[in-house]
């Protein structure tokens, strides 16, 4: 089946793969930023030691990413006339938005909240049990 799509692929100097799919006559734009980290990725190496996290940590952290500097990112996207969501599979985590409005500000927001490291500020008490007592937990508080 031929969908007659104009697809451009490029790998940036930092390794990020960019895929642009142009669909003529479509009014809506969708942007997705994904990482090859998912539910199966529960081991983390810190200072030469392997820390094994409980399953569910990737999905939990996906939800925590929606809080940027104390604000709910969903509200920030809504103010830009966008809908947003995310998913975590066994092998990847992705964040995306769609809009019929201008894409420059929401694209910058997507890149800012996914790329920029910051300390997580919202860790509910029950989820603290997911983290071992280590410097990792201190970084997440």
Model-derived regions: residue spans:
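His/Glu-rich zincin catalytic helix
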Residues: 1-73
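Acidic/histidine-enriched segments that form metal/cofactor-coordinating
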Residues: 35, 64-141
């Amino acid at each position: 089946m031929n969908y007659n799509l104009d697809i451009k692929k490029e790998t940036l100097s930092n390794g990020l793969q960019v895929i642009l799919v142009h669909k003529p006559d479509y009014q809506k734009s969708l942007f997705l930023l994904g990482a090859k980290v998912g539910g199966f990725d529960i081991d983390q190496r810190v200072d030469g030691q392997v820390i094994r996290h409980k399953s569910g940590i990737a999905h939990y952290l996906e939800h925590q990413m929606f809080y940027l500097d104390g604000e709910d990112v969903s509200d920030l996207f809504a103010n830009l006339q966008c809908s947003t969501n995310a998913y975590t599979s066994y092998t990847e985590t992705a964040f995306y938005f769609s809009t019929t409005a201008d894409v420059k500000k929401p694209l910058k927001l997507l890149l800012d909240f996914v790329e920029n490291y910051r300390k997580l500020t919202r860790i509910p008490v029950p989820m603290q049990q997911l983290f071992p007592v280590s410097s990792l937990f201190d970084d997440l508080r």
